[in-house]
Regions:
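Short hydrophobic beta-strand element within catalytic cores of glycosyltransferases
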Residues: 42, 241-243, 258-267
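Acidic donor-binding loop of glycosyltransferase active sites
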Residues: 236-247
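C-terminal alpha-helical cap of glycosyltransferases
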Residues: 321-343
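Active-site and donor-binding regions of nucleotide-sugar-utilizing enzymes
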Residues: 8-9, 13-15, 25-36, 41-138
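A short, well-ordered alpha-helix in the C-terminal region of glycosyltransferases
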Residues: 308-322
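Donor-nucleotide binding loops and adjacent catalytic segments primarily
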Residues: 161, 166-238
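A nucleotide-sugar donor-handling region in carbohydrate enzymes
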Residues: 117-182, 204, 208-211
Length: 343
């Protein structure tokens, strides 16, 4: 008898970004470290995600046909997993009913009590606004709530928080998610480059304007494009970062990088505002008029206020300790053994 087998079911691409699939891989890394066999089942994941999965010893299975419904779940079941971990808002009731009909144990990663699941063995909400009352309809499920369970990729965890460096100009990273759905990278980079900073611009693997962004950055003297293979190191080496308000918020907090978090989707509102209250990010609604001007002003104010920046660094390191993925893995193992351990 081989090791237990967990299947991560999550999608990523230009329309929905890469947050769901990347944080699912962080869960997978935690389970691999505990001796599990892990695979990712996805529909249309970009090559960069598949490389990340391979580097983490996580296999990949392509889901064909319509994603998120009963037919999708039937394909999942044929892989014979011991546990399915589902992350995404498009998985409907027929998807979960199919899993239940096959008596397939499943857990869900959720943000705002939007999951359509009815009988998960475990629910993970890694956001600081998460409360047990949001999941009262799952009385038998293990609940993992809050930043104690923040999912950090191994590449980030292995770098760890660094010491601040004295620089002539502060280094600023711009990283608006895997796909930049509101097309903010170019406008924000142009505004931020007007400040006396060393600007680094990340281009997400699902960003459809990658070549245009690269060409624009080449025209700016104090800007350069980030090598995607060194993204985690670039984030860790940054003095400040302007980022999409998704899971990168937790990575930057752990690494001690003060951030300006741009809300680019409705499902980020509650989590990013709670993070703002926690003190390690300054949130801006990227859907509002002229977010690039607001981001430039916020960045300028942060650079000019070292006491505030230091407080944000301390708040981030206090809030995210880097052990979330392992805690989630241990809790999943316990839930499969029938021993709920709510956190």
């Amino acid at each position: 008898m081989g090791p237990p087998f967990a299947l991560l079911r999550a999608d990523g691409g230009p329309a929905i970004g890469l947050g769901h699939v990347m944080r699912s891989l962080a869960v997978g890394e935690g389970l691999v470290e505990l001796g599990w066999k892990v695979a990712l089942a996805s529909s249309g994941a970009p090559a960069a995600v598949l490389r990340a999965a391979e580097a983490a010893s996580i296999d990949h299975h392509q889901i064909g046909g319509p994603s998120g419904a009963g037919q999708d779940a039937e394909q999942v079941v044929t892989l014979r997993p011991d546990l399915v971990i589902v992350d995404g808002y498009h998985f409907d009731t027929s998807f979960y009913r199919t899993l239940e009909g096959h008596r397939c144990a499943h857990a869900v990663i959720d943000d705002n009590s939007e999951t359509k699941a009815s009988e998960p063995i475990l629910v993970l909400n890694q956001n600081s606004h998460a409360q047990a009352s949001m999941y009262a309809r799952f009385p038998e499920a293990t609940l993992l709530l809050g930043l104690r369970f923040a999912l950090l990729r191994r590449a980030v965890r292995e770098i760890g928080p660094g010491e601040s460096q004295e620089r002539i100009r502060p280094r600023v990273l711009i990283s608006i998610g895997g796909s930049d759905p509101l097309d903010l990278t170019i406008s924000i980079a142009r505004e931020a480059a007007q400040l006396d900073v060393d600007l680094r611009v990340a281009i997400g693997p699902s960003n459809c304007r990658g070549n245009e962004i690269r060409g624009m950055v080449e025209t700016i003297d104090n800007a350069s494009v980030v090598d995607p293979r060194a993204y985690a190191a670039e984030l860790a080496a940054s003095d400040f970062a302007i980022i999409g308000a998704g899971s990168t918020l937790w990575e930057a907090a752990y690494l001690g990088v003060p951030t300006i978090g741009l809300i680019v989707a409705e499902n980020q509102v509650s989590s990013s505002r709670a993070a703002n209250l926690d003190g390690f990010t300054h949130t801006i609604d990227g859907r509002a008029p002229h977010p690039e001007a607001m981001a430039k002003t916020a960045l300028s104010e942060l650079i000019a206020d070292p006491l505030r920046s230091a407080a944000m660094i301390e708040a981030g390191r206090r809030s995210v300790d880097g052990l979330g993925a392992r805690r989630v893995g241990v809790a999943l193992v316990a839930a499969m053994d029938g021993g709920p351990e709510n956190g």
